[in-house]
From Swiss-Prot:
Localization annotation: Cell membrane; Postsynaptic density; Synapse; Membrane
Domain PDZ: 155-242, 250-337, 424-505
GO CC terms, sorted: axon; basolateral plasma membrane; neuromuscular junction; neuron projection; perikaryon; postsynaptic density membrane
Domain SH3 positions: 539-609
Protein name from the UniProt record: Disks large homolog 2
UniProt gene name: dlg2
CDD domains attached to this UniProt entry: PDZ1_Dlg1-2-4-like (cd06723), PDZ2_Dlg1-2-4-like (cd06724), PDZ3_Dlg1-2-4-like (cd06795), SH3_DLG2 (cd12032)
GO MF annotation list: ionotropic glutamate receptor binding; protein kinase binding
Keywords, sorted A to Z: Cell membrane, Cell projection, Lipoprotein, Membrane, Repeat, SH3 domain, Synapse
Length: 881
């Protein structure tokens, strides 16, 4: 019956989705243009192809994760019987045709994926060379701030692969993608697909015709139908903006008191020029490094910063790259040439491009040390490409500290702020301390401010800046102090701190130049006021798996550019010689990534987490139990049969599971796990833990029976394979269970670690043996295991390294949203159980998965399994950190 219900669900899901595509929301020009449901790499996988009528149907229909009234929602385990939950189909329904349609609430994006071994020009009609056509010949001439846009046209012939054409589209008359343009635009080229193999189609190309079908002014759905009906050989006639003529030059800037001194706009999802994701210079700040150098101009396109490309990055990523530079910055810049000859908003004289600096009235600092700005805003002449107000374009000044004079309109008037003279600053400590870092204190060179934490007391006051020398703290003279003495003075200064500071950029510059070499060698020391020791050990390199999420923007103590990562990421630690900071690169399937940065060491992570846990325990309510300890104790006391069989208790098993009792005594801090790369020749078992795991397991086996299997046939209600229970008349040995000859034999096998999990029910033993898992794995199927987290380690010991996925709920509310029948109390219990699972087995998980819908979670699980399938995988090593 269970298998029949599953088939019904799949058929019902296909029909329901085909008939109930959510309509696009009209009228919004601020859209999200990324495919909504699945990673492109996964969509091109054979796993995502359903079988229908004996033939492969390319792509699986997938809906948005939004709460559209037409969105399909999986049934949860406690939902009503299937006959009461099918949607009412009032219209006549044709046989379901599964296609991939990815929709979001504000825009529709069609993924047309595919992979072909070659792409060629149709012999019927050769692709002509690109034709340059001036838009004067069009009925409606597009303009960008008075400049006519020139287009070129190209015909591209693609051969459809097994899964489609290999690109994503957005737009249409019902939901324009760029401004009011009704065109159908290319939003993504899928790596390995037909379009990528051909190499001519580009992001932002506008499709005018598909074979003989005109799609220049049609709805999104009509364009999708035209692409679907185009056959195996597809001719696309596309329009693209003529590339801007520009010369590329390199500019070296040296930061001064006002940082780099320019503003930027643009980026992916925040285009400064419609259809262009580039980063543009929009303002040159008076007195900044860019103005003094004289070569950078408004309208220049930033191509690279040092070794980091700014092509196809978001605005935030570009800002982060520019902010995290040292004092010497190399820019690769594209400068416009003849395209601006008729542009009335061509490059202005930078000395006249903006009105004089707005007047800043700085009031006396209040109790919180903040400054009050009252600005008079004179009219600003339009920039070269500014069809939208600047506050909608994400324009941002790039300077040394975004909270001080670098932010537009917050420049300091020298009449009010005599930086070169010693000055008194009063700060009040907040949750982040004083909000700045210090360096120096060696050989009497002085103590300098090296970093201002955004949003901290120092930042909010606006009075302290990088390059300030700290002369005294609450009357304690620090002019000749060591780093340790200065840190102690700041720590012990109380809530209200009076600082005498003097801006000395030249002295600080010399000091920073000296420590630059140390940074290059990774001899970093913590620049927070809490520590300043500099320890150098022998250089050490290793690979680790991250067991926590790390966001560099949230770490105020970073000594240099940090490297963000997520749980499960593999990191190549290039240098682990320092006790506080390691230098690392993220490892991708293609090898080490180019991005390199600093990450906190294992010692630093664990020290900070212990300090946090002490605070949490101190603030806990009286009578509350340590969740980890209580959970472990509960598992030890309640030894009953369940879907998660607690491991059979015996002397050896107790020794093996000793970590459970140890964890109840001492909190386990997760930081990094040393790993090595290994080649495997089997399909890795899959263990999914957390809410909705049963639905995910069932769907994987139902959708991909050739890829996934279980230790027993799916029609059997039990997920365990071996038992000491006598065989019943209707049961078959080896099909329903492996019936053991005697209890003594099974107990012996358990003691010899031949079972990954075992339990007792009605005086009979049940369990899943290592051999049964290996049998499935060696036949090329991922063995789906419904076991507890303890089985992960036991499989590793047996050298069957599982893919262990933890479904981590976002919140109690999200659980109730995914399962409408859950009460708040039930959702809370489910959430608490999930958190305890993470606490107890977090170090063994391959990946954490989160999503707003079951469909989203399911797709992420498939993606993780595909990425982790091998043949090369990372496994725990015995190296000590």
């Amino acid at each position: 019956m269970k298998a029949v219900v599953r088939v019904l669900k799949l058929e019902e899901r296909a029909v329901h989705r085909q008939q109930n595509r959510p309509p696009a929301v009209q009228g919004s020009q601020h859209q999200s243009h990324s495919p909504a449901c699945m990673n492109p790499a996964l969509m091109s996988s054979p796993w995502v192809r359903q079988k229908h009528g004996g033939r492969a149907i390319p792509n699986r229909l997938c809906l948005s994760t939004t709460d559209s009234p037409h969105s399909y929602r999986y049934q949860d385990d406690d939902s009503p019987p299937p006959e009461h939950s099918f949607p009412r189909l009032t219209n006549e329904v044709r046989a379901p045709e599964l296609v991939h349609v990815s929709e979001k609430n504000l825009s529709e994006i069609e993924n047309v994926h595919g992979y072909v071994s070659h792409s060629h020009i149709s012999p019927l009609k050769a692709s002509p060379a690109p034709i340059i056509v001036n838009t004067d010949t069009l009925e409606s001439v597009p303009y960008v701030n008075g400049t006519e846009i020139e287009y070129e046209f190209e015909e591209i012939t693609l051969e459809r692969g097994n899964s489609g054409l290999g690109f994503s589209i957005a737009g249409g008359t019902d939901n324009p993608h760029i401004g009011d343009d009704p065109g159908i635009f290319i939003t993504k080229i899928i790596p390995g697909g037909a379009a990528a193999e051909d190499g001519r189609l580009r992001v932002n190309d506008c499709i005018l015709r598909v074979n003989e079908s005109d799609v220049s002014e049609v709805s999104h759905s009509k364009a999708v139908e035209a692409l679907k009906a185009a056959g195996s050989i597809v001719r696309l006639y596309v329009r693209r903006r003529r590339p801007m003529l520009e010369t590329v030059t390199e500019i070296k800037l040296i930061k001064g008191p006002k940082g780099l001194g320019f503003s930027i706009a643009g980026g992916v999802g925040n285009q400064h020029i419609p259809g262009d994701n580039s980063i543009y210079v929009t303002k040159i700040i008076d007195g900044g490094a860019a103005q003094k150098d004289g070569r950078l101009q408004v309208g220049d396109r930033l191509l690279m910063v040092n070794n980091y490309t700014l092509e196809e990055v978001t605005h935030e990523e570009a800002v982060a790259i520019l902010k995290n530079t040292s004092d010497v910055v190399y820019l690769k810049v594209g400068k416009p040439t003849s395209v601006y000859l008729s542009d009335p908003y061509g490059p202005p004289d930078i000395t006249h491009s903006f009105s004089p600096a707005m007047e800043n009235h700085i009031s006396s600092p209040g109790n919180n040390g903040t400054l009050e700005y009252k600005s008079s805003l004179p009219p600003i002449s339009p920039g070269r490409y500014s069809p939208l107000p600047k506050h909608l374009l994400g324009e941002e000044d790039i300077n040394r500290n975004p909270s001080l004079d670098e932010m537009e309109g917050h420049r300091f008037d020298s009449q009010h702020f005599q930086l070169r003279e010693p000055r008194k600053i009063v700060l009040h400590k907040g949750s982040t301390g004083l909000g700045f870092n210090i360096v120096g204190g060696e050989d009497g060179e002085g103590i300098f401010v090296s970093f201002i934490l955004a949003g901290g007391p120092a930042d909010l006051s606006g009075e302290l800046r990088r390059g300030d020398q700290i002369l005294s703290v609450n009357g304690i003279d620090l002019r000749g102090a060591t780093h340790e003495q200065a840190a102690a003075a700041l720590k012990g200064a109380g809530q209200t701190v009076t600082i005498i500071a003097q801006y000395r950029p030249e002295e600080y510059g010399r000091f920073e130049a000296k420590i630059h070499d140390l940074r290059e060698q990774m001899m970093n020391h913590s620049m927070s006021s809490g520590s300043g020791s500099l320890r150098t050990n022998q250089k050490r390199s290793l690979y680790v798996r991250a067991l926590f999420d790390y966001e560099r923007a949230k770490d105020s103590g970073l000594p240099s550019q940090g490297l963000s990562f997520r749980y499960g990421d593999i990191l190549h630690v290039i240098n682990a010689s320092d006790d506080e900071w390691w230098q690392a690169r993220r490892v991708t399937p293609e090898g080490d990534s180019e991005e390199m940065g600093v990450i906190p060491s294992k010692r630093r992570v664990e020290r900070k987490e212990r300090a946090r846990l002490k605070t949490v325990k101190f603030n806990a309510k009286p009578g509350s139990l340590d969740s980890k300890g209580s959970f472990s104790e509960k598992r030890r006391k309640n030894f009953i049969f369940s879907r998660k069989f607690p491991f059979y208790k015996n002397k050896d098993a107790d020794e093996q599971d000793g970590s459970d009792s140890e964890r109840s005594q001492e909190e386990l801090i997760l930081s990094y796990e040393p790993v090595i790369r290994q080649e495997i020749n089997y399909a890795r078992p899959v263990i999914i833990l957390g809410p909705m795991k049963d639905r995910i397991n069932d769907d994987l086996i139902s959708e991909f029976p050739d890829k996934f299997g279980s230790c027993v046939p799916p029609a059997n209600s039990s997920d365990q394979e071996d038992t000491t229970r006598p065989k019943r008349d209707y049961e078959v040995d080896g099909r329903d269970y492996h019936f053991m000859a005697s209890r003594e034999q099974m107990e012996k096998d358990i003691q010899e670690h031949k079972f990954i999990e075992a339990g007792q029910y009605n005086d009979n033993l049940y369990g899943t043996s290592v051999q049964s898992v290996k049998y499935v794995a060696e036949r090329g199927k991922h063995c789906i295991l419904d076991v507890s987290g303890n089985a992960i380690k036991r499989l590793q010991v047996a050298q069957l390294y599982p893919i262990a996925i933890f479904i981590k709920p976002r919140s109690i509310e999200s659980l109730m949203e995914m399962n409408k029948r859950l009460t708040e109390e039930q959702a809370k219990k489910t959430y608490d159980r999930a958190m305890k699972l993470e606490q107890e087995f977090g170090e063994y998980f391959t990946a954490l998965v989160q999503g707003d819908t079951l469909e989203d979670i399911y797709n992420q699980c498939k993606m993780v399994i595909e990425e982790q399938s091998g043949p090369y995988i990372w496994i725990p090593s015995k190296e000590k950190l």
